[in-house]
Amino acid sequence: MAQLQSDNQQLKQQLDWFKQQLFGQKSEKRLSADTSHPSLFDAPKPVEDSIPKETITYQRRQSKQRADECVTEQGLRFDEQVPVEIIEIPAPELQGEEAEHYEIIDHKITRRLAQRPGSYVVLEYRRPVVKHKATQTLSTSPAPTAVFDNGMADVSVLAGMLIDKFVYHIPLYRQHQRLQQAGITLSRATLTHWTQRAINLLKPIADSQLQQVLQSKVLAMDETPIKAGRKQKGKMKSTWFWPIYGENDEVVFTWSSSRGTAHVEQQLKGFKGTLLTDGYAAYDRFVKNKPEVILAQCWAHTRRYFFKSLKVETQAAEEAMQWIGELYKNEETIQKKQMTGQKKLNYRSKHSKPIVDGFFKWCYEQRQRIDLENSNPLSKALTYVENHKDQLCVYLSDPDVAIDTNHLERTLRVIPMGRKNWLFCWNEVGAEQVATIQTLLTTCKLQNVNPYNYLVDVLQRINLHPAREVAELTPRCWKDKFEANSLLSDLARLGKSDH
């Protein structure tokens, strides 16, 4: 009977979880504290001043603050790369019989944001065929170099396709429809071929970035699923992206057909430092017998276990999340005051370590409860903490280790966002190519590099650049070395010459 009740309780918890995923709030943020359970860290109430205070009975409207770059009264902001088309509005006074009595002394400017439909341009290179009058010899200038030999695609359209597919998540079949509507006839297979060839050109850059990232003292690593290739008719294989985040704000997406430890061993071969992860067992197996690697644990994943137990053990789960919440308040203070190095370490030791010690003591006391069954979500959360105490404390002794892997999880969002549009990869090669291009585009975002300008440059530069110096083409290095004088497409050069 007890077993039946336990099974029934677990099924109810699973049903509640599915309802939450479908209809409920997915964020772990607590919108408001439950007033029936006072905070563990309530500050003392301030002593009321005995001096009588004046009561203000009117309200003063606060003036609206505008950003420095605000150029119009509506708040429209743009930089110098945005084209501006000027439309002259004639003054009626200058059109009539008395026009000679008026003169223009100034202009009032009104600006409105407008949009042209997505457009494509065919570049026609006209090369004269020259004949020598005496010898009758014919000659002509060579065609400009293209990204692909004898290719029909300008670098601008290749970069645009990659940006549309992997930044804005527009599948190629929709891009193909847009081409047709613009009057361009190309097969979808051609677009796929162009995409694959362009990514293959970029692969050495992504590989070089992985080697740079592995030089970091602290790495963050996670995994996320992707369907790639057919397991059987009507069913796709489950494969995995394993992103690795380095200390210089660079991320590398690696891919594996499995979620086993072997991939971690392969990708992190030779790494020495601290590895920040969630509680997945593959990472524990990886660091076993590796004294040169320290495993650190993510506090956000720890909090998630208690969040899942809220409906079953509301009061205890709330208390646990209050403990962890105080750690995050300390991290906010560190960030606001821009603490680094020893100052950051001292602050964590003084303010966060006592909270961690108190939290572990609280967890121990909760585990002594005789009414807490092993199947209870709170029991699982407490066991999780007990099994990872050492890893959860690593960030207290190393200022370069973050409290969680949220910075990595934010970069991961491009994968589920892409899945909602292109659903899966047809084959495993396609999954590897997604990993390659997302490595570069996501790092562009982290480095505040315009991804379109970056791709236009490196797709032209990669075949001319020395292979031994390919690391210079990674987004972080490219920003310092080439961004100021990046290569343009022929279309962009035409646009500049017209102005």
Task: Annotate each language-model stretch with its function.
Residues V157, L162-D164, H176, R304-K344:
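Conserved catalytic alpha/beta cores of large enzymes that bind or transform nucleotide phosphates
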Residues M1-M152, L191-T192, A220-M221, K227, ...:
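Short, flexible loop/hinge motifs at secondary-structure junctions
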Residues V218, T274, V287-Q322:
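Conserved beta-strand -> loop -> alpha-helix junction used to position metal-binding or nucleic-acid-contacting
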Residues E103-I105, T140-P142, A228-R230, V252-T254, ...:
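Short helix/loop capping segments that flank catalytic or ligand/cofactor-binding pockets
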Residues Y280-A282, E319-H499:
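Acidic/histidine-rich catalytic cores and adjacent linkers
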